[in-house]
Each structure stands twice: as C-alpha cells, then as structure tokens.
C-alpha cells in the first residue's frame, strides 16, 4: 500500500512539472479528433456536438451487439466484462465497436482482452468473422516473466484466432530472444504469424530475431506486403521496416496496392501513420506507447514516446487522413517494470463486411 502511495505521489509531481511543457508535447489538430472511446453505447449514443461533418453516424443497428459472456473454462476462471463494456463509432464505409474483458487472475501478465468488431465495405465476404490476434511490446523479461509468458501464450491459443500479428519490441536482452520466440511459436493459427520489429529489436539482437523467426516459420514484414487467402478471396497485411528511419523507410509499403483492396498496415509506432502517407491502408495496428505505462488514472501520461503527445496514446484513434488506428498498450514495460492505469492487453479484431 505504501509503495502505491509513493508511486501516486511521484506521478502527481510529474504531472505538475509537465504542465509548463505541455505545449511542447501536444499538437494542435486541424479538426477535432474523433475517438471511439469517447462514444458510449447505451440506451442512447451521446455524440460530441462539434464532430466533423465527414463522419456519418448510423445508430440503427449498433444496439445489443455485446459479446456473450465466455462459457466453459473461462467462466470458471471468473473472467469479467466491464460495464459499460461497449463503445462504438461509425465512419463512412466503416463501423467499429469495442468490448473490453478484464481477465483478472486467470492469466498472469495480461489484464484485459480488448476486442474490436471492425466492419468495412472492402472486407471480402469470405473474411466475415475473421479473427485477428494482435500483441506488441512484450519486452521479455521486463514486467513479463516466465509464468506471464506462458499465460500469454495460453490466452492467445484460447482466442482461436485465424492469424497472429505482432508489433515488435520482443525482448530486453539477446539471451531472451530464443525463449520468447519458442513460446510464441506455440500459438498456431490457420494463416500463421506475421510481425514487424520495434526500436529495441533494431538497436540490439536483430540477427537473432530474424534467425529465430525463420526457424519457426514466422513472417517478418520489413516494408513488405503479404497476402492472406481464405475461401478464394484475399486481404493484405503490410509491415513497416524501422519506422523511426524515415530517410530510408519514408515511403509506405501500401502505395502499390489498390484502393478497393482491404489492407492492414502493421507498424511499431503510430507516429509513422501520421508522418508518412499510408495510402490504401484501411486499418493501422501499432504499439510502442505502452498506453503511457504510468498514467494519471488513465487520463493523462506524463511521458509518451510520441512526438504527438497524448494524441496516439492508446485505443482507437484516427490519423489526419481519417484512417482508423488501433494502438495497443502492449504487454511488457521499458525502463521501469511498472504499469499504472495502463493495463497490459491482448487486442482481438474481428472483421465483418459492411453491406448496408
């Protein structure tokens, strides 16, 4: 208890000291940002009055779409859903709803599963209900230790995903690369595992990671586009090589794709999707921010590894071209092995075809 009070006191001091420099880390947007997490679904949907007119909201079929409580094994583990658990936003051609499930002590090292039902006009019919598991920033062994890694793998297997996507920053030391890759290789999905690398991975142990990924048949997306095929149809997953080196990687790998393709762009940092034109991308997945790692009740993070400040902290956001971005808090930590009001999470995305 005393330790938590000390952390909260330190956080309060950091917050006060950061007020003077707040202008340095906050970017003025050309138009109001629209966040899914600001729109709660209940008997009515409350919408900010200043929403940009380019967003068209359709409330007709957004009710009663919460996932049913998990049965069987998960029920015994007392996994609980938050209340209110669902948030939604509709953009022209896209509908997104989210559900958060807190897993409690059922899985060490992971606090919650955040599921996004992502409905888009370019999703092929064969990909209706397609399940994507997305994790990032394991930083093994930081806060994530052996038991936590085992439980993370068990949780991912329990999700029965069709594909596993990983956003980079696998390790906190080269000696940890083989065990973390061996563990992730236990997660078998119909379409395999695809990953990009993070700044930690480029700074150290790059060759070790590439070698281990090849050994286990994982797909490394370094400015590369791969095709996911199902039922005679296809979608594309593209990955960014070192998004911090824009001199070499400042052209998006999605530029060669067609506007009516359904394209997922995987990048370690969300900043890349604002710094670089990511044309033809329909959904961007990113990590790196850790959700702030240490925040003031989840509302404000004194330190954010982004030159856009709080803008791309966590959750569903949009870049200036109104492309949706899902930014995960990740699993592990950097610098200090502590999280405060920035829960470690696994993200699930379920694809649906928008037909109306």
Regions found by a protein language model. Give the residues of each.
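Positively charged n-region of N-terminal signal peptides that target proteins for export
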Residues: 1-5
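Bacterial N-terminal signal peptides
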Residues: 8-14
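Acidic, histidine-bearing metal-coordination/catalytic regions of metal-dependent phosphoesterases
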Residues: 9, 19-131
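Extended active-site neighborhood of metal-dependent phosphoesterases/phosphodiesterases
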Residues: 93-94, 100-105, 117-119, 181-246, ...
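Beta-strand-turn-beta hairpins that frame and shape the catalytic cleft
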Residues: 111, 120-133, 218-219, 226-239, ...
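Active-site neighborhood of phospho(di)ester-bond hydrolases with catalytic His/Asp-centered motifs
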Residues: 135-136, 163-169, 192-199, 221-224, ...
């Amino acid at each position: 208890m005393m330790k938590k009070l000390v952390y909260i006191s330190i956080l309060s001091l950091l917050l006060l000291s950061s007020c003077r420099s707040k202008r340095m880390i906050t970017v003025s947007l050309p138009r109001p940002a629209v966040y899914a997490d600001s729109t709660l679904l209940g008997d009515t949907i409350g919408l900010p009055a200043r929403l940009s007119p380019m967003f068209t909201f359709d409330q007709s079929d957004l009710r009663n779409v919460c996932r049913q409580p998990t049965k069987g094994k998960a029920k015994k583990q007392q996994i609980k859903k938050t209340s209110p658990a669902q948030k939604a936003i509709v953009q022209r051609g896209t509908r997104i709803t989210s559900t958060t499930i807190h897993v409690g002590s059922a899985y060490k090292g992971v606090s919650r599963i955040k599921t996004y039902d992502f409905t888009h006009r370019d999703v092929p019919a064969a990909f209706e209900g397609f399940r994507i598991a997305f994790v990032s920033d394991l930083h093994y062994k930081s806060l994530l230790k052996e038991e936590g890694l085992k439980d993370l793998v068990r949780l991912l297997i329990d999700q029965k995903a069709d594909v596993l996507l990983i956003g980079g920053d696998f390790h906190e030391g080269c000696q940890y690369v083989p065990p973390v890759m061996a563990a992730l290789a236990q997660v078998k999905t119909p379409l395999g595992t695809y990953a990009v690398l993070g700044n930690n991975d480029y700074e150290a142990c790059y060759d070790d990671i590439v070698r281990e990924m090849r050994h286990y048949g994982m797909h490394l997306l370094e400015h590369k586009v791969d095709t996911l095929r199902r039922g005679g149809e296809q979608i594309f997953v593209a990955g960014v090589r070192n998004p911090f080196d824009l001199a070499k990687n400042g052209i998006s790998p999605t530029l060669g794709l067609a506007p009516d393709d359904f394209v997922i762009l995987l990048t370690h940092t969300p900043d890349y999707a604002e710094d670089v034109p990511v044309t033809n991308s329909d959904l961007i997945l990113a990590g790196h921010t850790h959700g702030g790692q240490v925040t003031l009740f989840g509302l404000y993070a004194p330190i954010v590894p982004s030159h856009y400040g709080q803008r791309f902290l966590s959750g569903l956001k949009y870049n200036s071209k109104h492309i949706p971005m899902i930014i995960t808090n990740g699993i592990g930590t950097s610098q200090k092995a502590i999280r405060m009001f920035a829960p470690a999470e696994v993200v699930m995305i379920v694809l649906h075809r928008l037909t109306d």
